[in-house]
């Protein structure tokens, strides 16, 4: 990509997200969403192949539909209340439509259909941007409007998202699809606690971005996109392969790794609000995600993955890409659990 075009695209993506996060006026929020969407499409189409074009088209159509629903909610609220303020979403119909629009942008179930397909069709770096940075703007709007959200609708979508994220990841061999379904499940965990304790949503988002970014960077350093390629990365970089497997278990929420921390605190907060059935159901469905991560760990580290005899193997003689940020990211992605006593004081 042309360096000048890359600078312009990167600046527009960052600026669009910052405008959404810093604005209290609905028109500026909508403009920020559009800037961000139009700038990220060239990033998704960087490969110039039919699969990438198809993924970018699916992303564009989904995000455009969500933006249309968001504008419908804003205009409906304006007609009833006369307010353009983000925090002043008082009309129930407008609040419901806005929740559906932001759920579509985030990839919450039942609007999750685009996330695995788009992530699978783009390069690893584009998938990293799609599953981390692109979640910031919709979640910031949900955070600002959390007191006026439709609670029952949000809880239903969050619970189904955790279930879909667990079931969808089973029997997957493509690493990008596995991370896409993991993203759907994590979005469910973030939104289910949003109306009870928004601070926990921010904590979960921070740890999710750390773990997902670290996993994608390790995949890029190993040039791994499938389970088979990941199992052969032991020859090339044993330390990186071990780190991938530990971080994947952390993504699944296995104690005592970092990924267990937000799930533990969310279940605790839901229990404090006299909700027993919901956290029990969420914990049981989280076992699905943990299962396919543990199965992936087993198939790539404890056994030899099935492969043909004439397949090219990776060796340490090959040059590995230098990623100086990986070391601190790996530490934060796996060893954040001791911070739990400090974080438990958050209100």
Swiss-Prot record:
It comes from the Eukaryota. It is an enzyme of class 7 (translocase). Pfam families: NADH_dehy_S2_C, Proton_antipo_M. It catalyses: a ubiquinone + NADH + 5 H(+)(in) = a ubiquinol + NAD(+) + 4 H(+)(out). It is found in: Mitochondrion inner membrane. One of its GO terms (biological process) is mitochondrial respiratory chain complex I assembly. The keyword Membrane applies. Its EC number is 7.1.1.2. The chain crosses the membrane at residues 4-21, 26-44, 59-79, 93-115, 149-169, 178-198, 200-220, 241-261, 274-294, 323-343. Keywords: Electron transport, Membrane, Mitochondrion, Mitochondrion inner membrane, NAD, Respiratory chain, Translocase, Transmembrane, Transmembrane helix, Transport, Ubiquinone. Signal peptide: none annotated. One of its GO terms (molecular function) is NADH dehydrogenase (ubiquinone) activity. GO terms for cellular component: mitochondrial inner membrane. Core subunit of the mitochondrial membrane respiratory chain NADH dehydrogenase (Complex I) which catalyzes electron transfer from NADH through the respiratory chain, using ubiquinone as an electron acceptor. Essential for the catalytic activity and assembly of complex I. Belongs to the complex I subunit 2 family. Core subunit of respiratory chain NADH dehydrogenase (Complex I) which is composed of 45 different subunits. Interacts with TMEM242. This is NADH-ubiquinone oxidoreductase chain 2. It comes from Cardioderma cor (Heart-nosed bat).
